[in-house]
Each structure stands twice: as structure tokens, then as C-alpha cells.
């Protein structure tokens, strides 16, 4: 049988009053990514031809934050219920395609669960995603006959027997475009809230003798939404623990999974060790035998084999060669490239610069817009003065150069191979090969010096 085309509808128009935020609810993040972006990504993974994003509150913010997303923006000017929301997208539905309804504030739904749901959809019927809850209070109960779903009964309308049912509605469903359009047109708002509910489609399908089947989510957290920051934090921690568990099973040693955050993707080699309170953002690649100390932040970096990153170092958009040592308290800013066996120590900042093989920048140093050759030693307190208040200039240092402590290199300037720069020197002109340069004033000794006396 030919597989039907698929489109997705994502409900994301709610304000999220209980977040106490100017940001629309679905833009609050899980693992550094807006909740609704997680759902959009899943819809793409399912192979959705069209993704209809229903938006309302904070529309300008939604469009700004999701400007690069390939979605059909569908405005719901008034929030009049879930069926009303889907109805806004109905004119775009093709009769013979499947439509899956998802929720922008339920970010942990998985591709596998949705594939099972789509596979289970009966011809001209509905497949409904349900879940069993130990405490189903407040949720619509699933009423079955001969295995099929015949109704969803809300808490306030349920009798004593129905209240004992543990299976509840999640709101996620699949049907074909023609059926959705037919049933949505018949949904009324004769209820206390005066809203149009998607759950009414179950009764309408049964009236038309169309089958409604339920597929149960195996993990309740897949369908949990976040209406406040407490629930958001719970989803965040669940998701992070899930990611940490996967990495542990792949051989990554995470010392404490409860104190690890992955806010992007991590590609890793063997025998990687990650200490507590490490944050990984964007796309990070770690080689074999990499050790990351406590409190480090890595964002969009490539780290070679046998690298040690000591505690509280921050690396962003950088490349580190094998057997390098970084930190503690080092900062690699965008464009930093360290070759193999380099050392970058405490309170060193490197930006848009290359450091050659075996070179050391160990203490209290700023290196910006620079090229440092191999086997150099850059002393404590060295500054590359790369900015004149309007433009940036380069410092180029050759191989086997020794730069003494408290040296300023005023760019643009070049230091040739083998040069030695004495401590306390200010370099304003190019330095030749194997030269020694010292610019500090001669030391004076004044005998019998009397310190000033404090006036009373």
C-alpha cells in the first residue's frame, strides 16, 4: 500500500500567562532550544510536506525567533479552542494526506511514538495518542468499546466508573485531510467555555461509523506540557538526564548526570571524561581521551585527542589540537585555533588567533587577531594591542620566540623567528630574527630614600 503524504499542524498560539513572561510560552527553551522548535524538528524528521504553525500571542516575537524555519505561518487571531486552532489551517489540507496534530508546549514527543501513531491510523478514521496516568485527575478519560475509542469524557462529566479509568487523552491525533475538514466544520461551542474542542472529533467520527483507535505513549514525559516554569524545569531535567544516560551508555564518563547540560549535539571519541556542571552548546566534537574539568562551557568547538580542559574554562567557536592543555579559567573566543601540544593557562583570553605547535601562553594574557608560531613562550601579562579605537590590526609572531612578562605588542607588528623580548617591553616596530629587544628604562637606585609621611 502506498504511504500517504503527511503534513503537521502545531498549536502554538497560547500566551502562557503562568510563565509570567513577555515571551510566548512556546519560545521558552528546553536544552537551549525553544520548545516549539523541538516540535518543528520532529515534524521534519517525520517527513512532513507542510508544517502549519498556528500562532497568536507574541506573533512578532514568534516570527523573529523562528525566522529561519520552513513553516506555513497561520494566524489565530482569537484563541477559541483547539478545534478552532486546527480549523485555521484546514484550508491548506489536502484531502488524501494524513494530518498530525502536535502541541508547541509539549517538546519531548518522539519520532518513534508518532510513527506508531501514524501507522495505526485506520482508513477514514482517527488515531489518538493516549497515556496511562497513576493520577488522571483533571484529564479527559478514554472510553473504549471492543478496543476502539468511542468517547472522551471530561473529569466533570465522568461517572464513578469512568473516574477509575487511568487512560487519558493527550490531544495528539492523526487523521486524513478530508476527514479533518468534514468534522471540524461540524464542531460546535455549546459548552461552558464557549470554545471549539478537538476532542469532539471523536464523537463525530463515531457518528459517521469511522473507527477511532488509541496508541499509548510508553513514557508519560513525552506528552507532558509546560504551563509554568516549574514544569519547564522538570522537562529540562528529564531531557538532560535522558541525554546523559545515552552518552553514558555510549562510553562517555559523565561524573554526575544530574549536573550535566547538553544544549546541542555532541560527537565524541573513546574514553571521554566530563566532570560536574559542564555545559555543552551548539555542535561540539570531542576526540579520544578528552578530559573536561568542572564548570567548563564548550560551544561549537572541535577538540582533538588527549586534550585536557581544566575547570572553569570557556571555549567558543574554536579548534584545539591533540595533546593540548587548557585552563583552568581560560577563555577561547571565536576564531581561536590551537595546534597540537599547546598550553593555554589561567586567565588567558585568545580571540581570532592561531597558536602553533608546542607554544605556551600560560598566564594572564590577551592574544587577539594574532598568529603565534610553534615552540613560543608567551610570558605572564602579555597583551597584543590589536585595536586603535576604530580598526583591528594583526600581530604576527614567528617560531621559537620568547616574549617576556608584561610586554605589549602594538599592532600591526611582526616578530621574526627566534626573537627574544625582555620583560616590560613595549613593541611598536617589527623585530628581526634572533634579535633581543628591551625598551624599559634603566633601573635607578636612590640611597637613603625617605617615604612620604602622611599628613595629620
Curated annotation (Swiss-Prot):
Keywords, ordered alphabetically: Acyltransferase, Cell shape, Cell wall biogenesis/degradation, Cytoplasm, Magnesium, Metal-binding, Multifunctional enzyme, Nucleotidyltransferase, Peptidoglycan synthesis, Repeat, Transferase
Region (N-acetyltransferase): 251-456
Cellular component GO terms held in the UniProt record: cytoplasm; membrane
Enzyme kind, highest EC tier: transferase
Pathway membership: Nucleotide-sugar biosynthesis; UDP-N-acetyl-alpha-D-glucosamine biosynthesis; N-acetyl-alpha-D-glucosamine 1-phosphate from alpha-D-glucosamine 6-phosphate (route II): step 2/2; Nucleotide-sugar biosynthesis; UDP-N-acetyl-alpha-D-glucosamine biosynthesis; UDP-N-acetyl-alpha-D-glucosamine from N-acetyl-alpha-D-glucosamine 1-phosphate: step 1/1; Bacterial outer membrane biogenesis; LPS lipid A biosynthesis
Cofactor binding notes: Binds 1 Mg(2+) ion per subunit.
Stretches the record annotates as Linker: 230-250
InterPro entries: Bifunctional_GlmU, GlmU-like, GlmU_C_LbH, Hexapep, Hexapep_transf_CS, MobA-like_NTP_Trfase, Nucleotide-diphossugar_trans, Trimer_LpxA-like_sf
Superkingdom in the source lineage: Bacteria
Single Gene Ontology BP annotation: lipid A biosynthetic process
Cofactor(s) essential for the protein: Mg(2+)
Pfam family, one: NTP_transf_3
Protein name, entry field: Bifunctional protein GlmU
Amino acid at each position: 500500500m502506498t504511504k500517504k503524504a503527511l503534513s503537521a499542524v502545531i498549536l502554538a498560539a497560547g500566551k502562557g500567562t503562568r510563565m509570567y513572561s513577555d515571551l510566548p510560552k512556546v519560545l521558552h527553551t528546553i536544552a537551549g532550544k525553544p520548545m516549539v522548535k523541538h516540535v518543528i524538528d520532529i515534524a521534519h524528521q517525520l517527513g512532513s510536506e507542510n508544517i502549519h504553525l498556528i500562532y497568536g500571542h507574541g506573533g512578532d516575537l514568534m516570527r523573529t525567533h523562528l525566522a529561519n524555519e520552513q513553516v506555513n505561518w497561520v494566524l489565530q487571531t482569537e484563541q477559541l479552542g483547539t478545534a478552532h486552532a486546527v480549523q485555521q489551517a484546514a484550508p491548506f489540507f489536502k484531502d488524501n494526506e494524513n494530518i498530525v496534530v502536535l502541541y508547541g508546549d509539549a517538546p519531548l514527543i518522539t519520532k518513534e511514538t508518532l510513527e506508531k501513531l501514524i501507522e495505526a491510523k485506520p482508513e477514514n478514521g482517527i488515531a489518538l495518542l493516549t497515556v496511562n496516568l497513576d493520577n488522571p485527575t483533571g484529564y479527559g478519560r478514554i472510553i473504549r468499546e471492543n478496543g476502539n475509542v468511542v468517547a472522551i469524557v471530561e473529569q466533570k462529566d465522568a461517572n464513578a466508573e469512568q473516574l477509575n479509568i487511568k487512560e487519558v487523552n493527550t490531544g495528539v491525533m492523526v487523521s486524513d485531510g478530508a476527514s479533518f475538514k468534514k468534522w471540524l466544520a461540524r464542531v460546535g461551542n455549546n459548552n461552558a467555555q464557549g470554545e471549539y474542542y478537538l476532542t469532539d472529533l471523536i464523537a463525530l467520527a463515531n457518528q459517521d461509523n469511522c473507527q477511532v483507535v488509541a496508541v499509548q505513549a510508553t513514557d508519560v514525559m513525552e506528552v507532558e506540557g509546560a504551563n509554568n516554569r516549574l514544569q519547564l524545569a522538570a522537562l529540562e531535567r528529564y531531557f538532560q538526564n535522558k541525554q546523559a544516560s545515552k552518552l553514558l551508555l555510549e562510553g562517555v564518563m559523565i561524573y554526575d548526570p544530574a549536573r550535566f547540560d547538553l544544549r546541542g549535539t555532541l560527537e565524541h571519541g573513546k574514553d571521554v571524561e566530563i566532570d560536574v556542571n559542564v555545559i555543552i552548546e551548539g555542535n561540539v566534537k570531542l576526540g579520544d581521551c578528552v578530559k573536561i574539568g568542572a564548570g567548563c562551557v564548550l560551544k561549537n568547538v572541535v577538540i582533538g585527542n588527549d586534550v585536557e580542559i581544566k575547570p572553569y574554562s570557556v571555549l567558543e567557536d574554536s579548534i584545539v589540537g591533540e595533546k593540548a592543555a587548557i585552563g583552568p579559567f581560560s577563555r577561547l573566543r571565536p576564531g581561536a585555533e590551537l595546534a597540537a601540544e599547546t598550553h593555554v593557562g589561567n586567565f588567558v583570553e585568545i580571540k581570532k588567533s592561531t597558536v602553533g605547535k608546542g607554544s605556551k601562553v600560560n598566564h594572564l594574557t590577551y592574544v587577539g587577531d594574532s598568529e603565534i608560531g610553534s615552540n613560543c613562550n608567551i610570558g605572564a601579562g602579555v597583551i597584543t594591542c590589536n585595536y586603535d579605537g576604530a580598526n583591528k590590526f594583526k600581530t604576527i609572531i614567528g617560531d621559537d620566540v620568547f616574549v617576556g612578562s608584561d610586554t605589549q605588542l602594538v599592532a600591526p607588528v611582526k616578530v621574526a623567528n627566534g626573537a627574544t623580548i625582555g620583560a616590560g617591553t613595549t613593541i611598536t616596530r617589527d623585530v628581526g630574527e634572533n634579535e633581543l629587544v628591551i625598551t624599559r628604562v634603566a633601573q635607578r637606585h636612590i640611597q637613603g630614600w625617605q617615604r612620604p609621611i602622611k599628613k595629620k
